[in-house]
Structure formats: structure tokens, C-alpha cells
């Protein structure tokens, strides 16, 4: 039932039309003192008891009776301040008596006496004596009559439109007007062919049946233009009502009302970390299959927009799910908002879902600053449907807020996806011309071909590398193609005057530019340096210089035939970065630069898809399948994941590092992909019988008193195996570098590693050897304890904890990784801890399979190293890391890809 304002003389009703006009409605407070103040301000008496009027549970007051200073704003949403009391005169804004027909004419003809009492309506009781001017009441009546006449005129016009199509159903009428696409027409005819729309009362939304709600939401999501057309005929509800209908508490498609309720409580409690967010949207493929769900006693696999399955025989099955996630601009919160089962995640459908989501977040007081999507064909269609212009000549990076005409929202394409598009274009063109030179793909091929190149065989060796003749070049295959490391390596090879790299100046400049762009849109913490730091007024000029340079170069890019790339078929990667640059400038000018805004800085990774990819990665772990899941499997996995990681008064949290997700997403953009595509062979390490001499002065006295030739050699074998195995699995460039010897400053230039090699053995780093030595010492210490009577898994977890405890006292391990710790988010679980854990797990697995046959202990006979090597290598090939889930809370994190978080 529609409620009316309880103030005397006010006929404002709580309808969609009233809320569209900016009015809000407020219930009487529950606090006794505050409630009594409101009652006295209303100034009403009960007509029967002649006593003061007591409001019921449904009594409300409209915002007309409050001062503007009584409200406080949360984004677009307004809320009454605590202690606010209605003070605006009830008759300051004239309101007429709600009468019709002859009664209306009579009251206009008869003048009111000067001391008349107010006439009560059906919705109001008698009040205390209050003066009311005759002119004000007549004016209100005339205004109301004009509004009613205007509404009747529009209604008559709309119904005449239907009468012109006498004999046609609604869908036929829409087809005749050419408002429906073929896909939408087929969907509506299949699901609503027998829908008797003319028999329903469409004016009262409270009386809508489930089928009416489903029809309205389906029509809106398919086309807002069609919805607006039909709304004139059937009086369909405003989109704000649809947002409410699509909210669900149970684990089914639609918006998660529990999440929105939690966010609303945080906003209303004044938590500023929840006032601004970015919105991420992504589609995930599903397997088209119908399955019987015993729990719901229904078939699963149909399309579902949140109001029930579209289960007609001719309706296509769901093939994709669209997910939406909010990421806090401040703080470290991120939470999935809901999902929808669709047959095809078209750009227009995703645009409609975005509008509903933005409006729903606005209703609870959260302001959406930006939207991020993939750089796909459907995403481009979605951007255009929102009002984004991607063309270089007329670029528009913002679109209008669906609930506020005065607010704009920025649009971003995911930077990682843009890198992949640029990589494909670079490899396809082979050569890209621009004003600073020519970038050649062949230079990257020549770089990876230097793998295992001995420095002693090189014609020219710089004086700085004169003592590295027994070293070999090892290309760090985890290095990103577009990185400063590759650019520095090419720059160094250019200085050596090597023939394959004599014309690589243009390639170096191109790689550095793309790397700088990615760093700008991937700033992760406020302690970052250079372009990886936050967006501040102090750093804006430097960042803006790179953005201007990128625009200047991108508009001049051309292939070998002088065809402009930015106007060709493979332009989206370059145009996407230009659009992101405009969006970043707009955000800085509107939120960071103005002193009145609460934005001290801006971290651009808040607009990255890494957050959503993290959720999907964890979702796939719950699914335990590499193929596309069915609708029922996805729904159950989503519910299990949400239940596991969403605690009371907590937003969705994760123990997996976002930084690792970012590296994993760019795995196919590393140098190893070039090695694989062009057949560059990588020499495997072969161990021989000859002894390896290395300084082990840091060993314990008990070990020093022994003949350590075999012991030393075996430990180095283990360290070498661990280094080679992890270098093939890790995707972090800095962590791989830390595995190899780096006793000289010139041991690393960009992506090139100068690794000491003797008798086929790559020397591991000193820190790695120390870790392996500590691992062996701890295992020996506990080898005769009762712990070895435990099952294998429990024994491994026990040893892992003991080794980590022993390593915690060694602060000088892998010191070269210290700067690398600030590349990701500030957190306790960083790459240093993860690297230690990976080394420990790898060592224990190798040792567990070979200790019975080749124990690491001193004996008089020399071990057959070839046999040891062969057995160790076989065990490494079969090696899979175990879970580390039960480790102490300080080092516990979720592993993936056979136990390796960086894979």
C-alpha cells in the first residue's frame, strides 16, 4: 500500500514519481525523546479522543518539512542527521485538498472563512487550528488539476498507440515498430508468447506477480529503448524498483543483498573507506548443460537474470555468467556483488547490468569512480553503449551516472589485456615504425637465443666482465617482454656491437614506453617509487609527461607498408591505453587535485582486473576442474567460496597475493613464450663426478671436522636441482635471479644473468646453499625422533614449520630481493617468505624420495654422482609440491598450480 506524508495539509505520497522528483520519506524515530519532538512539530490531534495524535508504525514525513541543513550526503544518497526535527512550515509550500469532480469545483467556488479549520483528508486526522489563506489553497488545487489533466492526456495518447495495432500482441507491435533485434524477439516470443499483458494492473508495483517482474526485467536488460517505449503504455516501474527485485539473499543469480546490506551499514556508520569504489565486470564461459538439482527440485542450466529461470523450450541455455565486483578506492576491501546467467554476454546487456549495479551502490551511499572491463569486442560494444568514444580523434573517457545527471564515471580497459593485444600486434607486424625509430620483433628472438652462451666464446668482452670468462649467459625466461629488464639487456648487447643487436635503439625505446605505461596503471602501494608510485600532485607532472609521449608516438605508429596502425585492425591495444590515460587525467583533476576532496593519492591498481581474476582463480580451485563449469557447479562453488571467506561483519577477503595474480596473468607475455615459439633450445644441467669447490666457512664446527667432499657436493647438487626446478616454475623475475650466484655486481644486466658454470653445473646462489644446508641440518636433527612415525603428510608439515622457525633467525638471506618486496601490496606474506617455502617444499620432496637409497651422510666410498644425478633428476620430474595450508598463521598462504603461487 502506498503511504502518504503524515503532515497536515501535505498530500505527498511515497511513489516512484515522488522519488524521481528528489523527495525522500522518513519514518518517525524510535528514540522516545526524538519521537516526541517530531510529534509536537507535526501538531496533530486525534479526532476521536481529541488528544494529541500518536503516529503508527507506518507513519512517515516527506523531505519538504526539513531544512536543507538537516541532511547529510553519502555520495548521491541523502540521510537525515541525528537529532533533526521537522521545522519547515507545513503551509510554506501550498498543498491543496485532494478532491475530485464536483467536490473540486465546489471548493474552488466557495471562499473559506478567515478563521476556518483545515479540512481533513482520508489519509489525515484533524489538527490544531492553523491559518490557511484562500489564495494558497485555490492555487494548489488549480496546479493539481493541471497535472492530472496532463497525465490523462499522455495516457490517452499511449493507449491510442495500442488501438492503432488492434489485433496485435505487444511483441508484434514492438516488431512492427522495428524496436527489437532478432535475438531479443526470439527470447521474448519463446518465454512470453502466452503472456496476457493487457489483463494485469501495471500501475501498482506491489501487486506485480513473478511473471510480471520477470517480463519487466528481461525487457529492461535486453533494451532500455524498448523498455522506455513499453513503459509509456504499461506504466512499467522505474529502474530503481528493478534493482530491488534483482536482489537475492539465497545463493542464486542476481545481486547479493547480504553484501549490499553490509556495505550500507559501513557507510551509515561513517566509515570513509567504503564511500568510494571502482566497479569490475567480466564474463566467464559456462558449459551448456541441463542438470537436475535435488536440493531445489528443478532443472539447472537456463538463463537467469535474477528473477527466475527463462525455461521455455525455445529459450537458449546459459553459456556465460557475468560477474560484478566492487573494489574499495581506500583500504583493502573487495567483494563480489553478484552474477547473472546469460546466453551471450553482449555489450548492451553488460551495459544495462552496470547501470543497475551503479544505481544500487548509489542507493546505499557508495560512489563509483570508474568501471573496468576486458578489452574484447563485447567490452568495446559495452563502452559505446554507455557513451564512451574510443576513436582517437574524438575520445570521451567518461559516461553519465545513471542516477545523477551531474556526475560522471571514468572507464578503463584492463591493462594486462591491453599488453596482450600490443604483444600480438608487435609479433604480427614484426616491425613497427614511429617517430623515434623502428621496433623489431627479431631482437627479442635473438635475445632468447643467447641462452647458455659462454662468455669465453664471445669476440668482445668488456673490461667489467674480464673475470667472468668461466660464466655463461642465462636469459631469465620469466622476464616480461615489455620491461625495463629486456630494454636494459638489449642496451647492453648494443654496446657490445654484436651484429644481431646493432639496430635495436627503436626496439629499446618502444619496450620502455610500453613498460612505463603499464607501471603507471599498476601502482600498488603508497611506498612505490617512480612511475610505480601513487598518483600525487607531486608525481603528476612526471606521469603526465609519459602519457603525452605515448599519445604522440601511438598516433604515428605504422607498419612496413606505412599503414597507420591506430586506424587499422589491431589498434585496440594502443587506443585502450590512450583511453586509460584520459580517464586517469580526469580522475586526478576531479578527485586528487581539488583540495576539498578526501583523496590524498590514488593507486591505479584499484582499476585492475587482478582483483576479479583472484576471485575466479579461487573459484576454479573450489570447482576442481580445468574445463568450463555448468551452471549448477558454478552456483554451488560460488556459494561455498562466499561462505568460506565472507565472515560476519567482514567483506570478502583472500590470502592469495594480488601481486602474484598479476604476474600469473602475464605469464604468456614473458620471454619463455618466445623461446617456445621459435624453438630455442635450453640446455639442461648435467652433473658430473668432478668435485665442486666453494667456500663453506659458514658451516658448523662438527661438519668442518669431517671430510666434506661428498657432503659438500651433495648439498650443491640439491641446491642446483632446486634452482633449476624452481626457475622453470616461478614466474617472478626477481625471485629466479635470487636462486643463482650473484657475488659480483656485474652478474645481472637486465634480463641477462651471468651464472658461473663448471663441469655442467650452474652454481646456485650462496643464500640458496645456506637454506639447503639448514634444511638438511633440521631434517637430520629430527630424523630419529618420534615424528618420523607419523604419516608422510603430517611429517612434512612438521618439518616445514621447524625449518621456517630455524630460518627466521637468518636476516641476510636473499638480500637482493629486499627492494622487490615493495612491488606488491604491503602485507606480511611477501615473495621472500614464499620463496623460502617453495625451496623447503622442493627440498623435502626430493629428499623424501631418495633418502632411503642415497642418504646424505659421510661415507668412505665416493658416491656415484652420475647415478645420483639420474635418480635425483627422475625424482624432480615427478615432483609435485604439497599443500602448505596448515602452516603457522604467520607464513600460511594459499598455494596454486601444484603448490607454486607464482606459476
UniProtKB/Swiss-Prot annotation:
It is an enzyme of class 2 (transferase). GO terms for biological process: DNA integration; DNA recombination; DNA transposition. A motif (HCFC1-binding motif (HBM)) lies at residues 123-126. Pfam families: THAP, THAP9_C, TNP-like_GBD, TNP-like_RNaseH_C, TNP-like_RNaseH_N, Tnp_P_element. It comes from the Eukaryota. Coiled coil: none annotated. Its EC number is 2.7.7.-. Gene3D superfamilies: THAP domain. GO terms for molecular function: DNA binding; sequence-specific DNA binding; transferase activity; transposase activity; zinc ion binding. Keywords: DNA integration, DNA recombination, DNA-binding, Metal-binding, Transferase, Zinc, Zinc-finger. PROSITE patterns: ZF_THAP. A zinc finger (THAP-type) spans 1-89. Able to mediate mobilization of P-elements when transfected in Drosophila. PANTHER family: THAP DOMAIN-CONTAINING PROTEIN 6. Active transposase that specifically recognizes the bipartite 5'-TXXGGGX(A/T)-3' consensus motif and mediates transposition. This is DNA transposase THAP9. It comes from Homo sapiens.
